[in-house]
Amino acid sequence: MTLTDTTIDWDLATDALVESLRDLIRIASINPPSADAPDGELRAARYLATTLEGAGLTPELVEPVPGRGSVHIRLRGDGTGGDPLLLLSHLDVVPAPPERWTHAPFDADLADGYIYGRGAVDMKGMVAMELAVILQLAAEARAAGLDPARDPIPGLRRDVLFTCTADEEAGGAAGAAWLVEHRPEWLAAAGAVNEAGAVSTTVAGIRFYPIGVAEKGYAAYRILVSGTWGHGSMPREDNAAVLAAAVIGRLAEPETIRLTPVMTRFLDDAAAALPAGAARVARAIASGDDALSAATLEGLCDRRDAVVLRALLRDTISPDVIHAGVKYNVIPGDAVIEVDCRVLPGTTESAMRARLVERMGPELAAACTIELIIWGEPVEAPAEGSLFDIMAQAIRDHDPDGVPLPVMVPFATDAKYTAHLGVPTYGFSPLRFEADERLLDRFHGVDERVSVAALRWGLPVLYDVVRRFCG
């Protein structure tokens, strides 16, 4: 069944989606929980459970840590189509100090066609969109005289799982990681639809829809720098703050380009769609020549896109925290640097650590001890095959001028846990943005917002993907 076979009122469905999203934003599911909102994730999970129960469904809710809730529902197909499709989302949001917001971050204001609030794009908008698809499928079952909690949904050959987790923003220990150990059936599927992909980005007048098929791995390190304590009136070369500054200077230099298969495909597909001049730039970047790429990158896209693209072409090292010194006239003998590294597929933790030492050089490295804080493997899914092809075709059907293409994202999501279960997981939260809008400007940003028009476009796209993959 496709959209052309239905009489769904998508405007009415979008109105309900918008109200669900606004309700969810008003639940301050902040991670880490605050004294003012200690149980926001649990309240968000209960909201979804209550909404699903109102549609005649029987959701499950778990609370592995007090105040941290995850929720799940399974809609049944007739069992002839193989393993399920997983619609995966998270309920938690990062903090949102309100001082610079023009609309309070948890008021869910609707202004000028946009819904404002923390979580509008990361990722309660997708939660509400997935919820709308589930409610639509349940309504179709009821219209056929069936019980959606028990009977197969008309036209579905696979089950559809809808799982919303806690704790994604802090690593997932109280969310997806717990589910892998205790409720793996909530995640086990033939494929998963996740956040951070299929949101349009306009380059050289072309609307691209990058579908996330890979995520960089991550390694955080604590670098302990040893110097000699002394009096500030007698400067010395082994001042730990000075040594730390030198370390940071060396680590901050960009790594060399290393093209992965996903990014080679991304650049090739982009070049095929771009006007001639921009296409030449894309091919120049794909050549892997560092000097050429650095000079030409911003000829392909604006600075916002260039920052992202640079990160996807290399391993990255970002010194983000430094502590040194106790008083202005005391030379510090110790300093601490915390470094965020994001690694391409093929880079191991030991290789990243060795690279830090190499970048420091032997003299500085001798003054440093490197401790691993956290490590996560890169994640990859096939950039071809049934689910990817269905997602790409759904975008083309709803935006004939749009260009879907595979991409890697620079950050980590709950896909790192579904990958442990062998579930190919894709960044696919379809939204059609205006030409000057960028998704990553909104993630964790001030005045986070999403337009009603973008949601109205994305809802039938997601519904089509579910129907086509599961039908």
Where are these regions (language model features)?
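Acidic/His- and Gly-rich active-site-bordering loop/insert found
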Residues: T2-G119, A143-R158
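Short glycine/proline-enriched loop/turn "hinge" motifs that connect secondary-structure elements
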Residues: P98-W101, P152-G155, I211-Y218, A311, ...
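Short pre-catalytic strand/loop immediately N-terminal to key active-site residues, enriched for Gly-Thr
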Residues: A111-D122, P404-L405, V446
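Acidic/histidine-rich catalytic neighborhood of metal-dependent amide-processing enzymes
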Residues: I115, V121-P210
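Acidic-enriched catalytic cores of C-N bond-cleaving enzymes acting on peptides and small amides
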Residues: P184-G191, G197-I206, I211-A220, G232-I322, ...
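Active-site-adjacent substrate-binding region
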Residues: I248-I257, G277-A282, A291-A294, P382-R432
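C-terminal substrate/ligand-recognition segments
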Residues: K327-M360, G376, E380-I395
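Zn-dependent metallopeptidase/amidohydrolase metal-coordination segment
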Residues: W375, D401-C470
